[in-house]
Amino acid sequence: MSAFLRVADLPISLRSQYLASLPEPQEWFLEELVRTGEVWEFPCGGYAIFHGDTLVEFYALDSTNAHRHLSNLIQQRPFRKVLCKSFDRVLIDAAQKLGWALVETGFLFRKRNPVILTKSDTFHLERARAIDLPDAWMNGRDFYDSKDEVAQIFRSGDLWIAFNEGQMVGSGIMIPIDGSGDVVDIGMVTRPDQRNRGFASLIVSDLANLLESEGKRPICGCAETNLASKAALEKAGFVSEHRLVEIYIPD
């Protein structure tokens, strides 16, 4: 049995190999869980990261025996479910070999087609100022986790504010994912009383266009139940060929 041991620090070299093994970039939602996660490592080459009772990342150098390592892991460090990208085939295949149940819970957008959206001259996007933060939080409470998160994104220069006819109608974010800054996760939220007017698509389209003009790659995602966000992203040219998957372990 592989002896998994809890360690203080993420094994950087192994993690780099894991990210390089994926055919598509990491998801920001999972990256945030990894950043604050509980790390376990096993000597034969691999690691696991947990957020509470959820496994949020798993990697084994010996991919052909990944299901055996995964089976050993749950005996040594029990967990109730796994969060996984559908393009993480090693983990998906290992879970299926163990008879675990897979449920799709989110759309991951890693491809974008060229689109031109019509917008009025009164709509524009600009970097947030400190004075914008209270309104950005109030208008996006169902998107941001906390005031502190809004402030953190602002301090990193990744918070944008959308205005139409001089009033704030929403906000957008750009979060570099892979460490190089070339892949950037973007997101948007529209002020509640300004929704269903097309502003979400305009925000995400402007963010994506700006990144692409700098030679960067915008990616994004949304919950499978959030059909409004899915429609807005698709209108902005994004195509979802992948899913966020929850894997459940039978009792």
Regions found by a protein language model. Give the residues of each.
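Glycine-rich acetyl-CoA-binding "A-motif" of GNAT/NAT acetyltransferases
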Residues: 44-47, 167-170, 228
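Active-site rim helix/loop that mediates acceptor-substrate recognition in acyltransferases
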Residues: 18-38, 140-163
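A conserved beta-strand-loop-helix scaffold within acyl/acetyltransferase catalytic domains
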Residues: 50-53, 149-158, 163-183, 187-191
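Short amphipathic alpha-helix that is part of the acyltransferase structural core
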Residues: 1-25, 113-147
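Conserved acetyl-CoA-binding loop-helix of GNAT-fold acetyltransferases
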Residues: 64-76, 190, 196-212, 230-235
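Conserved active-site alpha-helix within GNAT-family acetyltransferase domains
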Residues: 70, 87-103, 201, 224-242
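Acyl-donor-binding surface of acyltransferase catalytic domains
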Residues: 47, 51-123, 247-248
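Conserved GNAT acetyl-CoA-binding A-motif
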Residues: 77-88, 211-223
